[in-house]
Amino acid sequence: MDKIAVYIHGKDGNVNEAEHYKPLFPQYDVKGFDYKAQTPWEAKKEFPSAIRSLCKEYESVTLIANSIGAYFALHSLAGQRIEKAFLISPIVDMEELIIQMMAQAGITEGELKKRKEIYTSCGKKLSWEYLCYVRKNPLAWNIPTEVLYGESDHMTSCETISA
């Protein structure tokens, strides 16, 4: 085959989820990318070389990415040889998500800046470094993309996806 569809999972997902997409892309080799990155700056180091290596033998590259995996892909793969992307409930505005999480936890920006890291009551870590990074590094994506947005998606609003 000369076509590959690379699947990038979301948080707590795994490379085996790529199997779900094989029937949807019958003319492609479908492979999952199992990454270690936990932050966008780690993804920016890890994703480009890994995707180039995975795709080097193929003429056509399609990306399928989910949730935070989609955000990491949007952040790190804009300059890669990808013909089309399919994003499933992607996080597309990390700053908005962090601010929303801070508001839900009753944490001010000043408090986060002072403490650097705060764990919310539901166990999620809020990080001043992460917030500053996403503000300084906005997404710049120029690859043709289709988005599948779930009506029960609580991470990204419909308005944000539509913008």
Give, region by region, the residue ranges found by the protein language model:
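Short, surface-exposed "cap/lid" segments of acyl-processing enzymes
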Residues: 1-38
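Structural motif
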Residues: 4, 60-62, 84
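Short hydrophobic segments within beta-strands
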Residues: 6-11, 64, 88, 148
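Alpha/beta-hydrolase active-site loop
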Residues: 17, 38-56
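Glycine-rich phosphate-binding loop signature in dinucleotide/nucleotide-binding domains
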Residues: 54-59, 141
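Gly/Ala-rich beta-loop-alpha elbow adjacent to hydrolase catalytic centers
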Residues: 64-73
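Aromatic pocket-lining residues of Rossmann-like dinucleotide-binding sites
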Residues: 76-80
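The alpha/beta-hydrolase serine catalytic core
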Residues: 82-163
